[in-house]
Amino acid sequence: FTDPWISAKDEFLVKKLEYLSIKNGFSIDSTSYPMPLALLRNPNEDMFNNITLMADYIAVADKIVEKESKKFINEIGFSSNSEFNPFRFIDSKFKDKNSFFFSNSYLGERFASKISMTIYESPFEERKYDFSDSYLALVSGNFILGIGNYDRWWGPSHHASLILSNYSKSSPGLFIRSLEGFTSPLPLINYFGKLNFSFFANQLESNRGIKNPYLLGGRLSMNPVNGFTIGLTRSIMFGGKGKDNSLKALWDSISGDASTMKGEQDGNIDNELAGFDLKYSFNLNNVVWSFYGQYIGEDGTDYWPWRTFYSLGTEFIYLEQGKLRSLVIEYIDTYYNGVDTGTNITYEHSSYTSGYRYKGTPLGAFIDGDSNYAHISFHG
């Protein structure tokens, strides 16, 4: 693995760091993937509370970083299934019924690149190859900037992120994110702890209701209290063939005015989702216990998301005979039960008729809209 970050596919590696961090009284933000390797090594200023546990944490982090930090690597892999698997979780490694991939990666001091080609069989697409998980990235100061596409997972759930997950193919575009987070001596900002952010501007496919719209996304997460993570997330589907692609319309979308007034050329210029997620973890008799939830809504008319849906979960992480174990219980509900109750609301849109999807599959939860899902899983 030659990436400047660790992807959601290797989430279980991060669980041991999460276990050691909570036991030592500090936090690691495990609610957003990919996670920069620099953030693994320096997750929180309070990591020095217990020298013994800190040494254990650093040893595990260094082992992960050493594994991920090879300068050059080639990878080949394949998967084969009798049928297309509609289930996909945070650590799922393949997306298609049958697939074969090859990738070539480079990781330098300030520069990283990856070219990956996948040949696949999928019921949702006519084209049988793509270049998902290919990018060029540059580290500048405390930022990672780049161009390309890769999977993102925004939210604390292990089975379905409501706003951005690995279920659809990754779309191409530009991105910028924090390398190891930001802190400030200013009292107001310092109160929120370490801040991590991620932003991208992608373009979606032509084979949809509105051809080639743009997808903008941003996430800010913070740790105001050790063990407690707050994430704020927003995505905007904007423009495309036949829509208003002007800078004014873009500003109206970003500022929130697009949902409260009509533009000059287009009365419904974007499709937005926004919301927040919370995760709190604590140590109880050498078991790290977490509670978490995500709350997302469709376009709002008063600068607040409405037509909302949610997920809830809890996780137990512990060591048994020196091996890490994880028990997860989650519930996800993408029905909307408020005003204008009915079906075809979540992930749907009157103008962007292909909905909140890319190449036919949801950008958010794999269960799509009008669904609920409960799951119990054990890893170890």
For each of these PLM feature ranges, what is it?
Residues 72-91, 112-123, 145-153, 157-162, ...:
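Transmembrane beta-strand segments that form the barrel wall of outer-membrane beta-barrel proteins
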Residues 19-25, 85, 358-360:
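Short linear interaction motifs
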Residues 7-19, 55-117, 145, 194-199:
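Transmembrane beta-strand segments of Gram-negative outer membrane beta-barrel proteins
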Residues 94-191:
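Well-ordered mid-protein domain cores that form the structural environment of catalytic cofactors
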Residues 2-3, 15-23, 30-65:
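Short, solvent-exposed alpha-helical surface patches in non-cytosolic proteins
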Residues 40, 141, 293:
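Residue-level signal for inorganic ion chemistry
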Residues 153, 173-356, 367-378:
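Signature for the C-terminal beta-barrel architecture of outer-membrane proteins
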Residues 7-11, 30-35, 95, 211:
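Soluble non-cytosolic domains of exported or imported proteins
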